[in-house]
Design a protein with these regions (language model features):
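Protein-protein interaction/assembly regions in multi-subunit complexes
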Residues: 1-190, 195-211, 218-235, 239, ...
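Extended C-terminal regions of large enzymes
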Residues: 152-187, 193-608
């Protein structure tokens, strides 16, 4: 019996009938899967079949908080999403911070399931137990920033707003659901929400999340704040942008659609220059003392007035991939992506893809329509982001999933750098092989987060030889399992270690919050979540063949830098993959075995 952390209530909203009901969430879901990503995957497994497509009325959007979401635990802001992705027509998980998750928990719900499809544009407001449907016709076409302004003026809700922009309305395959200035960034959930004619949701509450032992928890957090801040000092001063210089120097950066891994003359987009020339302050997520977001403003030039907080991945997408060395253009591109509601990472990679097609003479005059697609052209990047969001001209092609593009233009396929429809992150896997395995086996495509952030283990700590093969299966599995349980908790990975949430979990936070000491079981829960997601994938037709990387990664040697000459061949990759599958109790085709399913206690859970 839980005495805090959970409400054990699910809000199920049917858009087709403009109705809702509140359901109990079985306690067993929490005990075996914790919350967040794990419980969302369970509902997906039960309710979204393999035959359902992303834009089917039968597709659903499942939002789920974790036990620490909305609590005094540092960074307790995260909540998770599961749906069928328009990038692949397969399972996708995604997470966001912002205030919607914490406020949803305060309003009395651990999660929401959106089902059906509205016959007209709507938005939904949640005020504790009052759920209201509103006509959204007059706010269609508005940016996500404009939706926030509307919600504040009309409903007195500024924080706790979740919306899509024009990209979601136009079903861009990698459009986002924005949560204030944060987002469910990867996987195209914004397009699913747009297809359902749901423009926005907003929640407000004055209620706090119930805690098992609030006094002990607050004492622990007060004592821990120094360690939390001091453990990430450069995140406060420079944010994740600090990694741009590190990764570029090591020859592992995403450059020119992964043709190379070193960006020349890149100092103008390094964090030191960002801080010196553009930073105006820091922004923090709910209950976070680190405040890693670096708020930047362009003070002069054609992009004067642009304000955003570019992360490492966004800088990599537009700076590295598109070779844009004007940081002002990157700030503007980031702002526009947030406003239009599109994934900066996939957008940058798709524009880089177009730039390579242009480099190789594969785009005709009609497709180009006067666009200058030369590498480094920031003005063209800005133009294309709008064209993609509104599906105009070449933007309509680039708004599609890699699978759609490859089917329509087979000659373009070899230049699409993706796994399962999701583009690579800003890390070149030929520069550190574990990242390649992480991309290939990620539970949502080529993702460095869900797949495994191997940078610390392979590049900065010296724990593993980055070009080694043996041992990488276990390394990646451990990172993935850790991330799976952290995503199920409802906290951010940046501050997790200072609170004991590592691959060797410790501490009493979960007991203080829920009354149950989950800590010794966390890695097992993470592994259970990951294999559950793979069971979903297997049901949807994903096998070993889908875990392979693009040909460029496996056949072309890096031309320069500290990893010059490196290539991750199929034979090398297979060796890592075999080790990984064996440790997970998956068969040689990547399918979870009965032995593994039983060992992880998934057999009984999935009957319920």
């Amino acid at each position: 019996m839980f005495t805090g952390g959970y409400t054990q209530k699910l809000l199920r909203i049917n858009l087709s009938t403009a109705s809702y009901k509140v359901e109990d969430i079985p306690e067993s879901y929490y005990r075996e899967l914790l919350g967040g990503r794990g419980v969302a995957a369970k509902y997906y497994y039960d309710e979204i079949g393999a035959e359902v497509s992303a834009f089917s009325d039968d597709n659903k959007i499942i939002f789920m908080t974790g036990p620490l979401t909305g609590t005094p635990v540092y960074s307790g802001t995260k909540f998770q999403l599961a749906t069928k992705s328009p990038l692949s027509d397969k399972y996708i998980c995604s997470n966001s911070s912002g205030y919607f998750g914490p406020y949803l928990k305060g309003a009395g719900y651990d999660g929401i399931i959106i089902e059906g499809k509205s016959s007209k544009p709507v938005y939904i407001t949640i005020d504790d137990d009052s759920i209201s449907f509103h006509d959204a016709g007059h706010i269609m076409g508005k940016t996500t920033f404009e939706v926030i302004d509307y919600m504040e003026q009309t409903h007195d809700i500024k924080r706790g707003v979740m919306s899509i922009g024009p990209a979601g309305e136009n079903r861009v395959s990698y459009s986002c659901i924005q949560v204030e200035d944060r987002s469910f960034g990867r996987g195209g959930s914004g397009a699913v929400m747009g297809d359902k004619n749901l423009k926005a949701m907003a929640v407000k509450t004055n209620n706090k999340v119930k805690l098992h032992n609030e006094k002990a928890l607050r004492e622990y957090m007060t004592a821990n704040v120094k360690a939390c801040k001091e453990g990430k000092p450069t995140h406060t001063s420079h944010g994740t942008a600090q990694y741009t210089e590190v990764i570029n120097d090591l020859g592992c950066y995403s450059v020119a659609n992964f043709q190379t891994a070193v960006l020349e003359d890149a100092s103008s987009i390094y964090a030191t220059e960002m801080v010196k020339n553009y930073k105006t302050g820091n922004a923090a997520c709910y209950r976070c003392p680190v405040a890693c977001a670096q708020v930047c403003e362009v003070k002069e030039g054609p992009f004067k007035g642009a304000i955003s907080d570019p992360e490492f991945e966004t800088i990599g997408a537009f700076g590295g991939q598109c070779c844009v060395l004007d940081f002002a253009a990157i700030i503007k591109a980031n702002q526009d992506c947030d406003a239009f509601g599109i994934d900066t990472m996939q957008a940058g990679t798709m524009i880089a893809f177009a730039m390579e097609l242009n480099q190789r003479g594969l785009l005709n005059d009609k497709q180009l329509n006067g666009l200058d697609l030369s590498w480094g052209n920031g003005d063209t990047v800005i133009k294309l982001l709008k064209m993609i969001s509104y599906r105009e001209g070449l933007g309509d092609l680039l708004a599609k999933s890699p699978y759609e593009i490859a089917a329509e233009y087979p000659d373009y396929a070899k230049y699409l750098m993706h796994v399962k429809g999701m583009s690579y992150a800003a890390y070149e896997p030929r520069g550190f092989y574990g990242m390649g395995l992480a991309y290939g086996t990620s539970a949502r495509g080529a993702c460095h987060n869900v797949g495994g952030w191997t940078i610390r283990d392979e590049l900065t700590s010296g724990k593993f030889d980055r070009f080694a093969i043996v041992g990488k299966g276990k390394m990646v599995k451990d990172i993935q399992d850790t991330r799976a349980y952290v995503d199920s908790l409802g906290i951010c990975t940046v501050v997790r270690s200072s609170m004991g949430f590592t691959d060797n979990p410790s501490g009493n936070i979960l007991e203080y919050v829920t009354g149950v000491d989950f800590t010794p079981e966390l890695m097992d829960i993470g592994e259970r979540v990951y294999s559950l997601e793979r069971m979903i994938y297997a049901r949807e037709g994903i096998t070993r063949k889908d875990d392979y990387l693009p040909d460029r990664t496996m056949t072309e040697k890096l031309p320069k830098g500290m990893a010059e000459g490196s290539v991750l061949t199929k034979e090398m990759y297979d060796e890592m993959l075999e080790e990984y599958y064996d440790l997970r109790d998956w068969d040689t085709n990547g399918i979870p075995t009965d032995k593994g399913i039983s060992r992880l206690a998934l057999t009984e859970l999935l009957k319920g």
